[in-house]
Curated annotation (Swiss-Prot):
Keywords: Aminoacyl-tRNA synthetase, ATP-binding, Cytoplasm, Ligase, Nucleotide-binding, Protein biosynthesis. Belongs to the class-II aminoacyl-tRNA synthetase family. Its EC number is 6.1.1.14. GO terms for molecular function: arginine-tRNA ligase activity; ATP binding; glycine-tRNA ligase activity. This is Glycine--tRNA ligase beta subunit. It comes from Dinoroseobacter shibae (strain DSM 16493 / NCIMB 14021 / DFL 12). It is an enzyme of class 6 (ligase). GO terms for biological process: arginyl-tRNA aminoacylation; glycyl-tRNA aminoacylation. One of its GO terms (cellular component) is cytosol. Its main location: cytoplasm. SMART domains: DALR_1. It is found in: Cytoplasm.
Length: 720
């Protein structure tokens, strides 16, 4: 079956756009072919700096004929109605068929469309694709009306079958499709005629072009790591940089060079960031010292001097860049060693948000909240306050101004230079974590206190000014902040009720972080000269906001637990219980219940509970009373009743102390033990007996079962 080969050859495509462009080319062309009746077995797209390539294998040589029937008006319909139908079908009156139907004679149009050759369809689809290609940015050149990311020079478009290769007849803005491509710009310039994809790929490789970006990346990494290994060094892994560099070259030649000794004492992260951001260099690390001592650059050509001239030029440019970094570092160190006060004062003039004040005001709120939270997480309040006050000082430093991605990390270096203990200095770096779902969370008590305070201040602040996430829009990353709080609390095993003081082992130290943070925003507003809310307004806002924000946390928690395989209805059942602002308590309850309901006993007990609850609810509605006065074993008539009484006594003796100790696994296991006696009870006993004493006693027994089960979670909310 035929194979389609397309290449769009242009000036250099930005590396960041190549992968998406290849995907778009494949999607647009293949979708267009399928819509026109041309199916295929497989397709793959490629990208290099100068070309987008698509190969479609085993496609149809032509589209199938299409026969379409369209029902029209009645045969005796007004002439205007018939004329309108003729216009819509493109047929004449004599071409219509008259058919008998239950509603009389009706006109039908039979439209037959012959199949079309693949070349004709490909030409239409490719021209549409080129003219409507979704580049993030595009340009026009010369007198052309065509827009492309960079000037488009050639279109290669071939259909190859058993009889040979055929050029698809296509011209787009003066560029006529052909069977010619070009090799490497420097190593193999000139035209190359091809006859199909295999021939195309082979000739390009011979012309120093590696078509597959993944293969280029593998070649870069293998060559770079081998060069480093030969000198007892290692290349710092950076997959994003590797992908980007693979998009900058068609024939990668990794070269390893030296960094001038003047710069080797810079922090490794500074060297790595400067080389990556400015030069697209890989960093090479000394395994013993951990210092960055070499760099790897990737050339797009081979040279007779084995890259010596290229390395010399790159080293010269790199030295100029690193001289700037060294200047920033030395200036920052002088300020850090003097106590960082100028930086902290400068933050008074840096706006965090026009409705939430300056960075300095925010830091003051975070420091207060961190000190409040410190006892809850095992940290010293004074140390937490100090750490919070220093954590963001580096935002005013020259190094962070140049490289914003180093915020926090540089703060740790500067805090250490100022003479602060390592645990306080580490907070500057750790309190931003986690930045993503795979990032580690802070584990040191001081870092936990400040990280929680930072994220809670952000959340409560934006809730206070009604700037909440909506749909897919979350410009202030509030969902990430909430997930960060959830992960810090859960992964560190923290008992930290967000709103209510819930009785637990450390109840005397319980704080209310959401409430405290919201009140801090109220005070901040009152202290500003333009504060538009009275304190009574703020109190009402605090009450509303903390409940709404807690619901937001619960929504984020559902997403988090869903990834663990815990169903949303199980979480809802646990959310209905007291203490639902204690995230660890809530999750432990949900995990235990989820595991129990996965067992046969747990699932059957749930059905038994629902049956008991339904019978009891119907009886209470019919009788207008609540059956919760306690069942008496002396009125039990059957062995099954007596067995259920005994099983309840045994289970409650375990469940109540287990719940008090928050041992939900033991509580759910004891609850599941009721399954067999409850099943036997329903099999042998008629609850709504004619004897009213027996009936009331049995309903009270069901009420006791319901109450026992509801101590763990609101099982009425569980589906199934």
């Amino acid at each position: 079956m035929p194979e389609l080969l397309i290449e769009l050859f242009s000036e250099e495509i930005p590396a960041r756009m190549q992968a998406r462009a290849a995907q778009d080319l494949q999607k647009l062309v293949t979708n267009g072919l399928v819509e026109a009746g041309i199916t295929y077995a497989g397709a793959r797209a490629y990208a290099t700096p100068r070309r987008l390539t698509l190969v479609v294998s085993d496609m149809l040589a032509a589209s199938a004929p299409v026969r379409e029937e369209r029902k029209g008006p009645k045969a005796d319909a007004p002439e205007k109605a018939i004329e309108g139908f003729l216009r819509s079908t493109g047929l004449g009156r004599e071409q219509l068929e008259t058919r008998e139907t239950p509603k009389g004679d009706v006109l039908f149009a039979v439209i037959e469309k012959p199949g079309r050759p693949a070349a004709e369809i490909v030409a239409e689809v490719l021209e549409t694709t080129i003219r409507n290609f979704p580049w993030p940015k595009s340009m026009r050149w010369g007198s052309s009306s065509l827009r492309w990311v960079r000037p488009l020079h050639r279109i290669l478009c071939l259909i190859r079958d058993e009889e040979g290769a055929e050029i698809v007849p296509l011209t787009v803005d003066g560029i006529t499709a052909g069977d010619v491509t070009e090799g490497h710009r420097f190593l193999a310039p000139g035209e190359i005629k091809v006859h199909g994809f295999e021939d195309y790929e082979t000739k390009l490789r011979r012309a120093k072009v590696i078509l597959d970006a993944e293969e280029r990346a593998e070649h870069i990494w293998a060559d770079a790591t081998n060069q480093a290994f030969a000198q007892g060094l290692e290349v710092v892994e950076d997959r994003r940089l590797l992908s980007e560099v693979a998009g900058l070259v068609e024939f990668p030649v990794p070269l390893m060079g030296e960094i001038d000794a003047d710069f080797l004492d810079l922090p490794p992260e500074v060297l790595q960031t400067s080389m990556k951001e400015h030069q697209k260099f890989f960093s090479v690390r000394d395994l013993k010292s951990g210092k960055i001592v070499r760099f790897v650059t990737v050339a797009n050509t081979e040279t007779t001097d084995h890259g010596a001239t290229i390395l010399a030029g790159n080293r010269k440019v790199l030295s100029a860049r690193l001289a700037d970094a060294k200047f920033f570092w030395e200036n920052d160190l002088r300020i850090a060693r003097a106590g960082m006060q100028p930086w902290r004062e400068a933050l008074e003039n840096v706006t965090f948000h026009n409705k939430l004040g300056s960075q300095a005001a925010r830091i003051a709120r975070i420091a207060d909240l961190a000190a409040t939270l410190a006892p809850q997480v095992g940290a010293d309040p004074d140390a937490a306050r100090t750490a919070a006050e220093l954590a963001k000082a580096d935002l005013s430093s020259e190094m962070v101004f140049e490289f914003p991605e180093l915020q926090g990390l540089m703060g740790r270096y500067y805090a250490e230079a100022a003479g602060h203990p390592a645990e306080i200095a580490a907070v500057a770096q750790d309190h931003y974590q986690p930045l993503g779902p795979s990032d580690a969370v802070p584990t040191a008590p001081l870092s936990i206190a400040v990280a929680l305070a930072d994220k809670l201040d952000t959340l409560t602040g934006f809730w206070a000014i009604d700037e909440k996430p909506t749909g897919s829009k979350d410009p202030f990353a509030l969902r990430r902040a909430a997930l960060g709080v959830i992960r810090i609390v859960l992964e560190n095993g923290l008992r930290l009720p967000l709103i209510n003081s819930v009785k637990h082992h450390n109840s005397e130290n319980t704080s209310r972080p959401l409430f405290s943070a919201l009140v801090a925003h109220a005070k901040t507003d009152q202290e500003r000269a333009d504060g538009s809310k009275s304190m009574s307004d703020w109190k009402a806002l605090v009450a509303r906001s903390q409940d709404d924000l807690l619901s937001f946390f619960h929504d984020r928690l559902k997403v988090f637990l869903r990834d663990e395989g815990i169903r949303h209805d199980i979480i809802d059942a646990c959310l209905a219980m007291e203490g639902n602002d204690d995230l660890l308590l809530l999750v432990n309850r949900a995990r235990a219940l989820s595991e129990t309901l996965k067992t046969e006993d747990g699932e059957n007990l749930l059905q038994g509970f629902k049956r008991a609850n339904n019978i009891l609810t119907q009886a209470e509605e019919a009788d207008g009373v609540e059956y919760s006065y306690g069942a008496d074993p002396k009125f039990a008539e059957t062995d099954e009743e007596r067995a259920l009484f005994a099983a309840l006594d045994t289970a409650e003796a375990v469940i109540d102390p287990a719940l008090e100790a928050e041992d939900f696994a033991a509580a759910t296991a004891a609850m599941a033990s009721l399954r067999a006696p409850l099943d036997a009870f329903f099999e042998a006993v008629q609850v709504n007996a004619e004897n009213q004493i027996l009936r009331r006693n049995r309903l009270n027994l069901l009420s006791r079962i319901r109450a026992t089960c509801l101590k763990l979670a609101d099982l009425t909310r569980i589906e199934g």
